[in-house]
Curated annotation (Swiss-Prot):
It comes from the Bacteria. Pfam families: YqzL. InterPro entries: YqzL (IPR025617). The lineage of its organism: Bacteria, Bacillati, Bacillota, Bacilli, Bacillales. This is Uncharacterized protein YqzL. It comes from Bacillus subtilis (strain 168).
Length: 47
């Protein structure tokens, strides 16, 4: 989700999207185990 939000911001420059990115980033820092699970899904996609 972070990558998607960052990509949208980098393409549009939309400030609201950047603020959403920062909010999601902060939530992930509070719960790092969920971020690790999300990253693992990207490494090994389910077919």
């Amino acid at each position: 989700m972070l990558n998607f939000t960052w990509n949208v911001f980098s393409q549009t420059g939309n400030v609201d999207t950047y603020l959403l990115f920062k909010e999601l980033e902060k939530e992930n820092m509070e719960r790092p185990e969920e971020l690790e699970d999300e990253l693992a899904r990207f490494d090994y996609p389910i077919l």
